[in-house]
């Protein structure tokens, strides 16, 4: 077992546990957009950042394993600022018209944006407008894509097809 502190709570978790999994075992939810256990653990969204005592850089919690004696903060001011900036960057490349979206009210990105109190974007919007290929049997709306890689990983690892790319 590995002993560590998450948000000042002492916990013990099995070796090989990720910081995100350890936090969940402690009842702490770390926000995430791209994470799918055992399928997509690449930290593409950078939303799951946490602060680790003694480390200068914030670290992603979905793909970093716990170590003995770590002291982790999941919601420090530094983490909140970085998380908000990362979501704002994602939104700057996303069709940010939630009111007319079919997923409105059932969207992790929308919920996270609301939780982070994101009202406007400090970055210039760059939404990719690519026409749909009506001859291809699957539909992918590039204006909604947040480049999380989930669809690509599920297609590769679950379906074994490998037909998607960003």
Where is each model-derived feature located?
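Short, structural beta-strand-to-alpha-helix junction motif
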Residues: 17-21, 65
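Short strand-turn-strand beta-turns centered on an Asx-Gly dipeptide
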Residues: 6-9, 53-54
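Extreme N-terminal starter segment of soluble prokaryotic enzymes
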Residues: 1-3
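Fe-S ferredoxin-like electron-transfer domains
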Residues: 46-166
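Short, contiguous acidic and Ser/Thr-rich linear segments
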Residues: 9-17
């Amino acid at each position: 077992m590995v002993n560590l502190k998450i948000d000042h709570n002492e916990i013990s978790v099995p070796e090989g546990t990720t910081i995100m999994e350890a936090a969940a075992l402690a009842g702490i939810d770390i926000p995430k957009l791209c994470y799918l256990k055992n399928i997509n653990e690449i930290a593409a969204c950078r939303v799951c950042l946490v602060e680790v005592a003694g480390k200068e850089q914030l670290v992603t919690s979905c793909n970093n394993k716990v170590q003995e004696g770590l002291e982790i903060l999941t919601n420090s001011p530094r983490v909140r600022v970085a998380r908000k900036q990362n979501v704002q960057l994602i939104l700057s490349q996303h069709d940010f018209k939630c009111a007319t979206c079919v997923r409105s009210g059932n969207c992790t990105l929308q919920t996270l944006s609301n939780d982070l109190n994101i009202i406007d974007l400090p970055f210039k919007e760059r939404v990719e407008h690519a026409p749909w290929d009506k001859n291809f049997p699957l539909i992918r709306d590039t204006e909604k894509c947040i480049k999380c890689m989930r669809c690509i990983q599920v297609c590769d690892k679950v379906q074994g097809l490998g037909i998607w790319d960003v």
